[in-house]
Amino acid sequence: MLNILLSAILISTDVTPEIFFPSETITPARIKSEIVVVKDLNANTKPYAYFSFATGKDVAATEAKTRKWDIAFSKTTIAVNGGTSGPGQAGAQVLEQPFELIKQAPKDGYKTDSESGTAIPGGSGSSWYKYDMSVHAILPIVGRTILIKTAEGRFAKLEIISYYKGSPEEVPTEESSYFTFRYSLSDENGKF
């Protein structure tokens, strides 16, 4: 009833309502990127254990020739969905910078897997891990972060936390090839 009365008043007085639009552009606050922790991804498989950053889940090996995965693990080898390993746009680089300090994904420097090796180099001390001969353990190198350009062209930063089942704090005696890692996806501008 009130709406009818207001409409009648507006029509009878020939008043056009004004709509206010602010003159300055309002930019929404940037949402801080989420950090996801994946525990005990079993990489004791052949050929690989495939993983998607977008879904936060492993991907069936039958999807290896698709863009549904970004990164794959087999023992200490890490492959990306690009180059010789898959049809995606993925690439990687290892930075000697702590995970928390990386706020922006580099625009270049990403390598793809090739016949001569993976984008993320293997071998003790040359990438994400070192082999400690005194305790016969594979240990992540503190302060190393892997930057990934995903299969779809976005960016993720990744830190390997443990290579052993259950992420033991002491000298590992548990099963190996069980990756625990944390990652964060960037926004569309490559910011974390």
Regions found by a protein language model. Give the residues of each.
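Sec-dependent signal peptide recognition
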Residues: 1-7
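Short conserved beta-strand and strand-loop elements enriched in small hydrophobics
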Residues: 144-150
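Short, well-ordered, aromatic-rich surface patches in folded extracellular/luminal domains
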Residues: 163-178
